[in-house]
Amino acid sequence: MSPTPIPREHLDVLDRATSLFGRALATDLDGDCAACPGWTRRDCANHVLGGGLRYAAYFTNEPESEIGWTRTADHAGDKPVPALHRTSAGLRKRLAKAPDTEALVPHRLAEIPVRDLLALRVFELVVHAHDLAPETWDHPDTADLAAWLNEHARDVVELMRAFDVLGQAGAVPLGADARTRLLALSGREPTGTAVGGGNPTSSS
């Protein structure tokens, strides 16, 4: 089978998810993050910003000793939105240049296809946007992003859950829309709190 690059429309999904998280970063980062027990709001922001650097490093199989600093640095600083775009640029380029969506990337927990790494990054951006600022999900674009994730991210999310980096999935009400189903998949109640006090999304 011939190699298949990531479709342009999937890169567009990544760009839209990045913009969504940027809107969440425009809110105050002080205080605790109720949806991620044990994390502050700044911890949540820094996890996502550092994740952009870590995901890019997986393409070149960088050792943990070279990327460990990204887990503790204050990437957000005083200008979190510009920091998001700066820390996301390298991964965006790697994904755009990836020759095959099925090629395996050595994620820290398991080898996964490039397409799943993309889906996991979009999942991280969209779900943590809700953790920081639930009102960002009122944006018309979020329903489409949630539907895309329900279709493309479910398998890799369940793989991450097997490593105990996500809380248990929530029950899905009958007739639930895409956003509600995505919150349930992520282990969150519609209010944004973790189901049963589960783990934050620490999949990167």
Set out the residue ranges of the language-model regions.
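Structured surface interface patches that mediate subunit assembly and partner/cofactor docking
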Residues: S2-L20, A24-T40, R54-A76, P82-S204
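Short, solvent-exposed alpha-helical surface patches in non-cytosolic proteins
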Residues: R42-V48
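Short alpha-helix boundary/capping elements
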Residues: L49-L53
